UniProtKB/Swiss-Prot annotation:
EC numbers: 6.5.1.1
CDD domains reported in the protein's UniProt record: Adenylation_DNA_ligase_Arch_LigB, OBF_DNA_ligase_I
Enzyme class: ligase
Binding sites annotated in the UniProt record for ATP: 249, 256, 271, 301, 341, 416, 422
Name of the gene this protein is made from: lig
Organism (species): Pyrobaculum arsenaticum (strain DSM 13514 / JCM 11321 / PZ6)
Protein name: DNA ligase
Family: Belongs to the ATP-dependent DNA ligase family.
Keywords: ATP-binding, Cell cycle, Cell division, DNA damage, DNA recombination, DNA repair, DNA replication, Ligase, Magnesium, Metal-binding, Nucleotide-binding
Cofactor: Mg(2+)
GO biological process: cell division; DNA biosynthetic process; DNA recombination; DNA repair; lagging strand elongation
PANTHER family membership: DNA LIGASE 1, DNA LIGASE 1/3 FAMILY MEMBER
Active site residues of this protein: 251
Signal peptide range: none
Superkingdom in the source lineage: Archaea
Organism phylogeny: Archaea, Thermoproteota, Thermoprotei, Thermoproteales, Thermoproteaceae
Amino acid sequence: MQFGELVKALAAVESTTQRSVMVKLLASLFKKALPEEIDKVIYLILGDLRPPWEGLELGVGEKLCLRALAKATGTSQAELESMYKKTGDIGEAARRALASSKRPGLLAFGSQKPLEVSEVYDALIKVARATGEGAQDMKIALLSSLFARSSPEEGKYIARFVVGKLRLGVADMTIIEALADAYGVRKEDLERAYHVYPDLGHLAKLVASGKPLDEVKVTPGVPVLPMLAQRLSSSSEILAKLGGAAICEYKYDGERAQIHISQSGVRIFSRRLEDITHAYPDVVKAVREAVSAREAILEGEIVAVDPDTGEMLPFQELMHRKRKHEVAAAMEMYPTVLYLFDIVYVDGEDLTNEPLIYRRVKLSEIVHESDKVQIAKWQMFDDPDTVDVFFHEAVSVGTEGLICKSPTSEYEMGARGWNWIKYKRDYKSEMIDTVDLVVVGAFYGRGKRAGLYGAFLLAAYDPSSDMFYTVCKVGSGFTDADLKKMYEILQPLKIPHRHPRVSSKMEADVWFVPQVVIEVIGAEITLSPLHTCCLGAVRPGVGLAVRFPRFTGRYRTDKGPEQATTVAEMLELYKRQKKVAQPE
């Protein structure tokens, strides 16, 4: 496939505001791709070179990209920086530079063989793998060569890709729907395979080659999509929902981790499927000593503890582990305990279809507890009063509450069902729980906030439609430093119109690709004609909103947009409020 054909499709996707049109455009593109290149097409659309757990990054910043452009076009770096500053889009700066270049050495587009998708992808792989002495010069040489062969429009998307600002916001579920349409496979079969092996490039190659998806198996070293929980606010409701009995375990305030043990060693993956092994060398060592299985996939929570008292510390303290040069110091200041709560696979046996009570037995058989690795504290209950006693015990030792689970439940990869239910402590006069919402738009600040965004339009996610529905406009709770940080992280995601996966009645001053997730609290969930979340579910023409929303200060960098609070959860929160709200 010619790269220009991919670029033409990307431009069409970028210009649409309808998700259904986006799916059709992608399906049409996939039909034209050869089986041996479909994976590369998909990786480029998603803005990645490989799946997230491989951690392959280009290592190209904006300045290096502009240096490569300067070399390819003969345009000065100062002029390119000026173009970039004026447009706010490095892709547009690249397009203009390539369109206006009169450098004799620049190969005229059209007088040569057009770029192929595979050529572009392979060149970018070489850029990513250039390391060591002279790596920067090698990256510049490879990129400038690529720009020199690009049309202005092709260069626009190459520049955006290499600095991680593609701005398409195409989600994995959108790709799955388009693949199902293009190759005539059942969307449900693709989803199941994706939950087990969440590498869309790999899966696309399988379906394009006519290979059966049922051959996709749970594999140590490849993270599965984690099972997720719903939420309720009373023990009696929880037990009723779970059939009268529940395994209740402490809900630790840490980083959820998927631990993979194989012949190649121990690897740790985040809930976003990223390899975070480098941040937890102490956990790797502790797992090697505590787990007797040759191969296993375990689920747990990594919790920071006070080195002097052993008390559990808030999740935020683990952020010190994210800076590679600070890991050694962070291990001393913020040691961790791994609390294991599930097992997905052990020594050739896929346990995802086994009941939880059986998985618990398997977990206890292979884990030899220590001060660094423990099995999450749990008990079986069938009485709400005893659940509440256990709940208060959990809160008193520093946890967030309980996770209550059906003893007979299978491990439902990627699902947020009613077999796992969060039971968290009440926030007194505020909402029952915080919500994690996606930033989809912003409003310009005034006065002290001039030059920044003063408020943000937030949305909940609907997995069934793969859409984001607005819930509130929030401007409270942000410090001056927060507002500056929000502006910086959102600028690369700025787009000229509402994203096709966003449903909104409100007109924001600025729209973004749905990507950034933040935690919000409020007075209550109320009915509102201004927002689209659960529109018509309670009353015709009226949606749900967070009343008096406030940013808690917590950036949910551990969550992707599709892991945010769902519209179904918002409806459940509304229904369980003691007082039914009236329309605003």
